[in-house]
Swiss-Prot record:
TM spans (from-to): none
Protein name: Diacylglycerol kinase zeta
Species in which this protein is naturally found: Mus musculus
Residue ranges, annotated region (Disordered): 1-46, 59-81, 257-281, 421-441, 760-785
Keyword annotations: ANK repeat, ATP-binding, Cell membrane, Cell projection, Cytoplasm, Kinase, Lipid metabolism, Membrane, Metal-binding, Nucleotide-binding, Nucleus, Phosphoprotein, Repeat, Transferase, Zinc, Zinc-finger
Record-stated family: Belongs to the eukaryotic diacylglycerol kinase family.
Domain DAGKc residue range list: 292-426
Length: 929
C-alpha cells in the first residue's frame, strides 16, 4: 500500500480510503519497482496503522494466501482495463478480482477515499458500482484506484506451484471497512449507530466478508492479532467451499519428457478411456479436504426465471458463499461445473429457477453418472413450481433471507424422486388421412419428473407457446400471460377441441386395458402424474383414504397415478377438488390414432399418431425442506413449550411492509391489532391460520366489530419477526413446516397485500366521515387575527401554524381545501414545508385527490417537497394516498431524484420501490382495459 503522511492530516485522509483487508505476508510479494528505499522499509512494518485518534488498525495487501505471481499473458495493468461482472474461469483470471454490478446507491461515499477518488470533482453524481462479493461501492471511474490502496476482493482460489510448498489449510479473514453496518459489535455487543453517522465519512466498523463478523473501528474492539487469525467462514461454513480447495493449474508445457510420455502405449490406452470433456485441460482444479461435517454446495441460478429475481439472487449468493460455487446457467449450463466438482465428497446442489431448471440439472447428472449423485434442493423462482411445492420449498420466492435458505439446504432431508422414461414411435396403423403437417414425431423431452398429459391442458399450453414465439413482445407481462391463458382455455372449451379425446387413444397400464373405462368417462384431458402437485399447486389425486382400491400418492414409490379430467372436474380442481382416479401403475403403453397435443413437464407439442411407452427410468436424489425447531432463538433460561399459547394477532399493510420491513420497531408500531387467539403450544402455522380465520368469523370477533378496517383478504400471509434482522414473508405452502413459536413470541404478525394504507392506521381520520366527530378547542395561536383574514388565507395560516383544529373548523364552515396562494402552492404544500404531519393526514383524508399531484410554479408536487426535505413519514403518507412518483418538476427530477440529491438513500430506495410498483400496476391496468 502507498505510505501515508505521518501528520494528523495524512491519517485523516487515510481513514477515508477505508482499505481494511487482511492479508498474507506482504514480504513475499516483493517490492514494487516504483517505490523508494525509504518506502520499502515502511512496508516491512508488521502491518498496523492507527486510523485517526484511537481508530482500529488495518493491514493492506492481498488476503490470506501468498500473493500470486502475475499470470502469464495477463499483465497487471491489463486486468483492470475491463470491468468484470462475472466470475472469470479462464487461465488469465485475476487473484482477488471484484465482481461489479450496477447500483443506485448515492449516500455511500466512494470506497477509495477522497485522496484517490477521481470522480469527486464531477458536477453531477457519477455512476457507481458495487462488488457483490465484498459489498464495497466505488465510482466506475475509481475502480482502477483500488490498486493504489492495494485493496482486493476476498480470494476465491489459490495458486498451485512449486513455490507454495507449505500450502495453507485455513482461510484468513478478509477485513473491509464499513461506513454503515447493521447488527452489533462482536467484542462489546453494542450497535454501530449508523443512523447517526449516515452522512459521515467516518469508518464505524470493520467486518469480514467471509464470516460476516463485525467490530467497532477502534482499538478497544478490534485487536491486532485478529488480522492474521484463521476465519471460521461464519454460520454457513459447512456449505461454503473454501478458496483453499480451488487451485489454478498451470498449463502443461510441451517438454521433451512430456513428449516421450505421449508416445507410451499405456498412456494412449489410459487417455482413450476418457471422454473429450474429462480429458481436456482446465485452468482450475478442485482439491477438496473431505470432512464429515461439511456439505459443500453448488448454486445454479437461471436468471431468466421469475422476471428479474434470478439476476438479483445471484448477487446475494456471491456475498454469502465463495463466488466460484455460484453459477449463472445462462453462461453455458451446469455441465462444466458438475464436471469440475464431481469428486467433492458430500456435495449438494441448489437449483434456483423453475421446474424446467431442475429437470435440466437432473438430466445433466444422469449424463455424467456421478456416484453417488449429489442431492438437489430447489429455490423456486417464477410461478408454478409443482416439484418445489412437493418437496416443501414453496411455490415461489418472496423475500426470505438467503442466509435462512442456505440453512434449510444444509439441514434438509435427502429423499428420492422417481423419474420416468418416455419413448415415442410413429403408429404404423394410423391412416394417411390422420396425418397433420403441423405435428411432430418427437416429444420435446424423453424424461419427466412431474407429469405427462394429453388433451385440453396441453392444447391451451401449446397455443400459448406458439403465440409467444410468434409475438414475444406481447407476452412480457405476467398479467397478460394469465389473460391469454384464460382466453385460450375459454375458447377451447367453447370449440370442444378435446371432447373426442377418448375415441382416438388406447391406454394399457401394467397389462390392463383402461380404454373402455376412459370411453365411458369421456375425459377431455388425461394426466400421468408422478408428484402430488399439478397446475400451480392443485392436488388432482386428492386423499383417497376412503377408497381402498388406491394408495396415497408418493413421489418415490415407483408408481404413476393416471387421472382423467372432465370439464367439471377441471373446474373443481381450482377449489380443492380432484380428478377421476383411473389407476396406479408401473408401466404405460399409450397409443394415439391421430395427432394430439401433449405436454411433458410443461413443454408442449402436437404429437402425430404414435405409440408411447412410459417406464421408470431411475430415482433422483433430492433435498426436502425439513420441519424444524432449530430456527427458534435459544436462551439459557428458555422454558419448555407450554401446552397452550395466547398470542396477539396484528396485521400489517403492504405499504407499511415495503417501507419499514427493515425496521422492526417501526413496523410493529404501524401494525393494527386484530385480536387474540389461543393455540396449542406445538401448533404450526397451518393450524394457527385456521384459528385466525375462525376469529374473523366469530360474532364477537375482530371482523364483526369493524368489517371495513379489520376484515382480512384471502391473500394474507404470516410474517417471520424473530429469525432474521428484518421481517419477511412465509409462503403459504410452507406454513406446515414452521411452528408458531419459531416466528413469534407474544405477538404474531400477518401481512395483508390487499390492505390499503389508510385502513391500517385507525388513528387517522376516516375518509367516510368528511368532518371530525368531536369539535376541537382552538389553540391560542388560532384565536389571534382570524376574523381579519379572508377564508383562503386563514386556511393557509392554519396549515402553516400546524393548527389542525382551526383547519377543521374552517373546512366545516365551507372552506375550500384546494385553495392556492399566489405561487400556486396548495394547503398540502404549506403543511409539508412546515412538517405538520397532523395537517397532512387531515388534508389527505378530506381534500379532493387532485391535491396529491397539484404543482406549484416550480413544477413541484407536495411529494417533491417532502422528498427534498427528507420527511420520510410524510412521504409515506402521500405515497399511500396515491400520489404519482413519476411526475417531474421543471428540472426534470422525480421525487426519488430529489431524495437522492438530499442524500437520503433510504428514502430514495423506498420511493424507487414504490415507483416500480406504480409502473407495474399501471401496465396491468392498461392491459385489463
Amino acid at each position: 500500500m502507498e505510505p501515508r503522511d505521518p501528520s494528523p492530516e495524512g491519517r485523516s485522509s487515510d481513514s477515508e480510503s477505508a482499505s481494511a483487508s487482511s492479508s498474507g505476508s506482504e514480504r513475499d510479494a516483493g517490492p514494487e519497482p516504483d517505490k523508494a528505499p525509504r518506502r520499502l522499509t515502511k512496508r516491512r512494518f508488521p502491518g498496523l496503522r492507527l486510523f485517526g485518534h484511537r481508530k482500529a488498525i488495518t493491514k493492506s495487501g492481498l488476503q490470506h494466501l501468498a500473493p500470486p505471481p502475475p499470470t502469464p499473458g495477463a499483465p497487471c495493468g491489463e486486468s483492470e482495463e475491463q470491468i468484470q461482472s462475472t466470475v472469470d474461469w479462464s487461465e488469465s483470471a485475476v487473484y482477488g478480482e471484484h465482481i461489479w454490478f450496477e447500483t443506485n446507491v448515492s449516500g455511500d461515499f466512494c470506497y477509495v477515499g477522497e485522496q484517490h477518488c477521481v470522480a469527486k470533482m464531477l458536477p453531477k453524481s457519477a455512476p457507481r458500482k458495487k462488488c457483490a462479493a465484498c459489498k464495497i461501492v466505488v465510482h466506475t471511474q475509481c475502480i482502477k484506484q483500488l490498486e493504489k490502496i492495494n485493496f482486493r476482493c476476498k480470494p476465491s482460489f489459490r495458486e498451485s506451484g512449486s513455490r507454495n510448498v507449505r500450502e495453507p489449510t485455513f482461510v484468513r479473514h478478509h477485513w473491509v471497512h464499513r461506513r454503515r453496518q447493521d447488527g452489533k459489535c462482536r467484542h462489546c455487543g453494542k450497535g454501530f449507530q449508523q443512523k447517526f453517522t449516515f452522512h459521515s465519512k467516518e469508518i464505524v466498523a470493520i467486518s469480514c466478508s467471509w464470516c460476516k463478523q463485525a467490530y467497532h473501528s477502534k482499538v478497544s474492539c478490534f485487536m491486532m492479532q485478529q488480522i492474521e487469525e484463521p476465519c471460521s467462514l461464519g454460520v454457513h461454513a459447512a456449505v461454503v467451499i473454501p478458496p483453499t480447495w480451488i487451485l489454478r493449474a498451470r498449463r502443461p508445457q510441451n517438454t521433451l519428457k512430456a513428449s516421450k510420455k505421449k508416445k507410451r502405449a499405456s498412456f494412449k490406452r489410459r487417455s482413450s478411456k476418457k471422454g473429450p470433456e474429462e480429458g481436456r485441460w482446465r485452468p482450475f482444479i478442485i482439491r477438496p479436504t473431505p470432512s464429515p461435517l461439511m456439505k459443500p454446495l453448488l448454486v445454479f441460478v437461471n436468471p431468466k426465471s421469475g422476471g428479474n429475481q434470478g439476476a438479483k439472487i445471484i448477487q446475494s449468493f456471491l456475498w454469502y458463499l465463495n463466488p466460484r460455487q455460484v453459477f449463472d446457467l445462462s453462461q453455458g449450463g451446469p455441465r462444466e461445473a458438475l464436471e469440475m466438482y464431481r469428486k467433492v465428497h458430500n456435495l449438494r446442489i441448489l437449483a434456483c429457477g423453475g421446474d424446467g431448471t431442475v429437470g435440466w440439472i437432473l438430466s445433466t447428472l444422469d449424463q455424467l453418472r456421478l456416484k453417488p449423485p449429489p442431492p438437489v434442493a430447489i429455490l423456486p423462482l417464477g410461478t408454478g413450481n409443482d416439484l418445489a411445492r412437493t418437496l416443501n420449498w414453496g411455490g415461489g420466492y418472496t423475500d426470505e433471507p438467503v442466509s435462512k435458505i442456505l440453512s434449510h439446504v444444509e439441514e434438509g432431508n435427502v429423499v428420492q424422486l422417481d423419474r420416468w422414461d418416455l419413448r415415442a414411435e410413429p403408429n404404423p396403423e394410423a391412416g394417411p388421412e390422420e396425418r397433420d403437417d403441423g405435428a411432430t414425431d418427437r416429444l420435446p423431452l424423453d424424461v419427466f419428473n412431474n407429469y405427462f398429459s394429453l388433451g385440453f391442458d396441453a392444447h391451451v399450453t401449446l397455443e400459448f407457446h406458439e403465440s409467444r414465439e410468434a409475438n414475444p413482445e406481447k407476452f412480457n407481462s405476467r398479467f397478460r400471460n394469465k389473460m391469454f391463458y384464460a382466453g385460450t382455455a375459454f375458447s377451447d372449451f367453447l370449440m370442444g377441441s378435446s371432447k373426442d379425446l377418448a375415441k382416438h387413444i388406447r391406454v394399457v397400464c401394467d397389462g390392463m386395458d383402461l380404454t373402455p373405462k376412459i370411453q365411458d368417462l369421456k375425459p377431455q384431458c388425461i394426466v400421468f402424474l408422478n408428484i402430488p402437485r399439478y397446475c400451480a399447486g392443485t392436488m388432482p389425486w386428492g386423499h383417497p383414504g376412503e377408497h381402498h382400491d388406491f394408495e396415497p400418492q408418493r413421489h418415490d414409490d415407483g408408481y404413476l397415478e393416471v387421472i382423467g379430467f372432465t370439464m367439471t372436474s377441471l373446474a373443481a380442481l381450482q377449489v380443492g377438488g380432484h380428478g377421476e382416479r383411473l389407476t396406479q401403475c408401473r408401466e404405460v403403453l399409450l397409443t394415439t390414432a391421430k395427432a394430439i397435443p401433449v405436454q411433458v413437464d410443461g413443454e408442449p407439442c402436437k404429437l402425430s399418431a404414435s405409440r408411447i411407452r412410459i417406464a421408470l427410468r431411475n430415482q433422483a436424489t433430492m433435498v426436502q425442506k425439513a420441519k424444524r425447531r432449530s430456527t427458534a432463538p435459544l436462551h439459557s433460561d428458555q422454558q419448555p413449550v407450554p401446552e397452550q399459547l395466547r398470542i396477539q394477532v396484528s396485521r400489517v399493510s403492504m405499504h407499511d411492509y415495503e417501507a419499514l420491513h427493515y425496521d422492526k420497531e417501526q413496523l410493529k408500531e404501524a401494525s393494527v391489532p386484530l385480536g387474540t387467539v389461543v393455540v396449542p403450544g406445538d401448533s404450526d402455522l397451518e393450524l394457527c391460520r385456521a384459528h385466525i380465520e375462525r376469529l374473523q368469523r366469530e360474532p364477537d370477533g375482530a371482523g364483526a366489530k369493524s368489517p371495513m378496517c379489520h376484515q382480512l383478504s384471502s391473500k394474507w400471509c404470516f410474517l417471520d419477526a424473530t429469525t432474521a434482522s428484518r421481517f419477511y414473508r412465509i409462503d403459504r405452502a410452507q406454513e406446515h413446516l414452521n411452528y408458531v413459536t419459531e416466528i413469534a413470541q407474544d405477538e404474531i404478525y400477518i401481512l395483508d397485500p390487499e390492505l390499503l394504507g389508510a385502513s391500517a392506521r385507525p388513528d387517522l381520520p376516516t375518509p367516510t366521515s368528511p368532518l371530525p366527530a368531536s369539535p376541537c378547542s382552538p389553540t391560542p395561536g388560532s384565536m389571534q387575527g382570524d376574523t381579519a383574514l379572508p377564508q383562503g388565507e386563514e386556511l393557509i395560516e392554519a396549515a402553516k401554524r400546524n393548527d389542525c383544529c382551526k383547519l377543521q373548523e374552517l373546512h366545516r364552515a365551507g372552506g375550500d381545501l384546494m385553495h392556492r396562494d399566489q405561487k400556486s402552492r396548495t394547503l398540502l404544500h404549506h403543511a409539508v414545508s412546515t412538517g405538520s404531519k397532523e395537517v397532512v393526514r387531515y388534508l389527505l383524508d378530506h381534500a379532493p385527490p387532485e391535491i396529491l399531484d397539484a404543482v406549484e410554479e416550480n413544477g413541484e408536487t407536495c411529494l417533491h417537497q417532502a422528498a427534498a426535505l427528507g420527511q420520510r413519514t410524510i412521504c409515506h403518507y402521500i405515497v399511500e394516498a396515491g400520489a404519482s412518483l413519476m411526475k417531474t418538476d421543471l428540472q426534470g427530477d422525480t421525487p426519488r431524484q430529489r431524495a437522492e440529491k438530499a442524500q437520503d438513500t433510504e428514502l430514495a430506495a423506498y420511493l424507487e420501490n414504490r415507483q416500480h410498483y406504480q409502473m407495474i400496476q399501471r401496465e396491468d391496468q392498461e392491459t385489463a382495459v
